[in-house]
């Protein structure tokens, strides 16, 4: 198609292959972003394939609408959180889907706009909300109002930063004198909090992990992912597949555990001699290890370097007729 966007969806070929996209499929893109994955899946699904795309970012959804417009009524876009997909499916009259995708990454549209506050290459307000129209806590509010203990926990858990304590103390110390309201100021505070020897040898700016941690906290990203993973098996047709692309070790571990639990018949504690949970496997894991981008894709799109793809397939319901 002409006029393709600069946006490059990560692991697109692998997503299409592992989801088994074929003509006529009903596809849920729970984080449509700029529409790159949806466009690729629509092409693979042929003239009868349909995509229901969700995103809570109004700007991203608007861009996706422009690039997906040539597909007409084969695409329906809804501004909402990925965790709310069951209600959207019901409204669309889709009882089950044949394929579902969730990409937990950020789009260049979000990262490159200083007014959104996701990065610090250019100064801007400390916002970081993906769905600003919905209100909610901003990064500025979190930085200036959260206790030392909460800041430390957020930066340590979501940013996996060994200097979390020093950074949290520095933030609290600075905000006692003046509010921290911009991305540049926060980046400066974090920079100064790092030991000089760490700054000298760091492979990335010391503030990178803190910004990631605050963004994940503001947008409740792990809770959103967990809710999606819990609900999706109920909404996959037998043989339907779900793919999740993560960019953070916490996200990947969450996906791995969720898939493993749904691929296991009994989830009772190990000390339980007799099964009492009644749980039966609903998924079959198709990726024993996460699929990662090859060297060529990483050269072409550095964002793909940390992407990890896991895929699982819906098993027939217990008692269903699976005979040929």
Curated annotation (Swiss-Prot):
<dbReference type="InterPro" id="IPR002903">
    <property type="entry name" value="RsmH"/>
</dbReference>
<dbReference type="GO" id="GO:0070475">
    <property type="term" value="P:rRNA base methylation"/>
</dbReference>
<dbReference type="InterPro" id="IPR029063">
    <property type="entry name" value="SAM-dependent_MTases_sf"/>
</dbReference>
<keyword id="KW-0698">rRNA processing</keyword>
<dbReference type="InterPro" id="IPR023397">
    <property type="entry name" value="SAM-dep_MeTrfase_MraW_recog"/>
</dbReference>
<feature type="binding site">
    <location>
        <position position="103"/>
    </location>
    <ligand>
        <name>S-adenosyl-L-methionine</name>
    </ligand>
</feature>
<protein>
    <recommendedName>
        <fullName>Ribosomal RNA small subunit methyltransferase H</fullName>
        <ecNumber>2.1.1.199</ecNumber>
    </recommendedName>
</protein>
<comment type="similarity">
    <text>Belongs to the methyltransferase superfamily. RsmH family.</text>
</comment>
<dbReference type="GO" id="GO:0005737">
    <property type="term" value="C:cytoplasm"/>
</dbReference>
<dbReference type="Pfam" id="PF01795">
    <property type="entry name" value="Methyltransf_5"/>
</dbReference>
<keyword id="KW-0963">Cytoplasm</keyword>
<feature type="binding site">
    <location>
        <position position="110"/>
    </location>
    <ligand>
        <name>S-adenosyl-L-methionine</name>
    </ligand>
</feature>
<feature type="binding site">
    <location>
        <position position="55"/>
    </location>
    <ligand>
        <name>S-adenosyl-L-methionine</name>
    </ligand>
</feature>
<keyword id="KW-0489">Methyltransferase</keyword>
<dbReference type="GO" id="GO:0071424">
    <property type="term" value="F:rRNA (cytosine-N4-)-methyltransferase activity"/>
</dbReference>
<feature type="binding site">
    <location>
        <begin position="35"/>
        <end position="37"/>
    </location>
    <ligand>
        <name>S-adenosyl-L-methionine</name>
    </ligand>
</feature>
<keyword id="KW-0949">S-adenosyl-L-methionine</keyword>
<comment type="function">
    <text>Specifically methylates the N4 position of cytidine in position 1402 (C1402) of 16S rRNA.</text>
</comment>
<feature type="binding site">
    <location>
        <position position="85"/>
    </location>
    <ligand>
        <name>S-adenosyl-L-methionine</name>
    </ligand>
</feature>
<keyword id="KW-0808">Transferase</keyword>
């Amino acid at each position: 198609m002409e006029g393709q966007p600069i946006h490059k969806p990560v692991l697109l070929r692998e997503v299409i292959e592992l989801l088994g996209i074929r003509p006529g499929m009903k596809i849920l893109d729970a984080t449509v972003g700029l529409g790159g994955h949806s466009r690729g899946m629509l092409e693979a699904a042929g003239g009868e394939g349909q995509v229901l795309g969700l995103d809570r970012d109004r700007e991203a959804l608007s861009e996706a609408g422009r690039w997906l417009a040539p597909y007409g009524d084969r695409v329906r876009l809804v501004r909402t959180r990925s965790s709310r997909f069951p209600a959207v499916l019901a409204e669309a009259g889709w009882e089950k889907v044949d394929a579902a995708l969730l990409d937990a990454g950020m789009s260049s549209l979000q990262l490159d706009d200083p007014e959104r506050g996701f990065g610090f290459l250019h100064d801007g307000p400390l916002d970081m909300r993906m769905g600003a129209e919905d209100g909610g806590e901003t990064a500025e509010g979190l930085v200036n109002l959260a206790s030392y203990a909460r800041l430390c926990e957020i930066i340590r858990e979501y940013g996996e930063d060994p200097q979390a304590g020093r950074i949290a103390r520095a933030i609290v110390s600075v905000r006692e004198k003046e509010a921290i309201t911009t991305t540049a100021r926060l980046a400066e505070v974090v920079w100064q909090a790092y030991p000089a020897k760490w700054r000298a040898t760091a492979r990335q700016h010391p503030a990178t992990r803190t910004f990631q941690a605050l963004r994940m906290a503001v947008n409740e990203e792990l809770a959103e992912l967990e809710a999606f993973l819990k609900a999706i098996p109920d909404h996959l047709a037998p043989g339907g597949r779900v793919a999740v692309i993560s960019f953070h070790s916490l996200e990947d571990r969450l996906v791995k555990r969720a898939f493993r639990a749904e691929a296991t018949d009994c989830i009772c504690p190990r000390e339980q001699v007799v099964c009492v949970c009644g749980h039966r496997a609903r998924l079959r894991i198709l990726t024993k290890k996460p699929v990662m981008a090859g060297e060529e894709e990483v050269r072409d799109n550095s964002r793909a370097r940390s992407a990890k793809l896991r895929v699982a397939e819906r098993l027939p319901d217990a008692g269903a007729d699976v005979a040929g």
